Amino acid sequence: MAQTDSSAKEEVKVTTTYAPIIAFISVQKSDNSVDLKSTVQAKIRGTLTKLTGLKIEFTVGTDSTVKKLGEVITDSRGVAILNCKPDQLTTDKEGKLNFKASFAGKDSIESAEELVSVKRARLEITPVKEDSLLTVKVKLIDLSTGTGTAVPETDLGVFVKRMFSSLKLGEGKTDEAGEATIEIPNKLPGDAQGNITLLAKIDENEVYGNLEAAVTQPWGTPVSDELKALPRALWGTLPPLWMPITFLILMTAVWGHYIVIIFELFRLRKEEPKTAS
């Protein structure tokens, strides 16, 4: 005789977990500090989604020499940024900075980590003005040996800081002295005092990673930051007066014809002779 199983079947709950992706970079500044930036995303329901509210831990060093630098919560863009002062940073025997960004895991989000290893270096930017010629001299210095050493044959770019992003002004390659000179255009829009912020950058270098240096100079054209009503113009939000006036006249003429036609139809209907019954 077959036996029936009277026990209730247990429901197996399958919890979906997501593996986060950490994009991690370091930016070495001209004051010898380092910005650590991590962007955390995960593929959720087929869409790459930025993860907010996650605690990212930043450390420097390897194995037994690991030193905690700090913790940052990701913002609405999934980004966590930590600025590290020079006295917080330690290098290995090769003069490299070994950074790690790690996430311990939370709810359905799995743990993850990402490593970045770069040689210690510094980018310097010096403004030079000769008559009407404006230039900046950019120098790349290797600090991994403890003493400054010029780095030749390295590509870099110079930008001007704008409200939302930076505008590239030129690029160059360092010479044997580790220097490159880039010309700056005249009459760039500046702030109310005519100041512009110039940035020298090296991006994604195989040895040094990302480096940045900034300098502010009164080389721009003053642009008022006061809110003023713009004059009426074709390219503005307020058109010239002749445009709405012309439009109003044309629309009045068109709709006026319709009104006259409808009025005449009603008048003709009233004047239609009635047939005797």
Task: Annotate each language-model stretch with its function.
Residues 74-84, 172-185:
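Glycine-centered loop-to-beta-strand initiation motif
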Residues 25-48, 56-58, 82, 130-147, ...:
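Beta-strand-rich structural segments
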Residues 106-117, 206-224:
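Edge beta-strands of extracellular beta-sandwich domains
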Residues 88-97, 188-197:
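Short glycine/proline/serine/threonine-rich loop/turn segments at secondary-structure transition edges
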Residues 220-277:
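C-terminal single-pass membrane-anchor helix
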Residues 3-19, 111-119:
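Proline/serine/threonine-rich low-complexity linkers at boundaries of modular beta-sandwich domains
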Residues 55-70, 155-171:
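Short amphipathic beta-strand segments in non-cytosolic proteins
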Residues 96-109, 195-210:
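Enriched for extracellular/lumenal, surface-exposed ectodomains of secreted and cell-surface proteins
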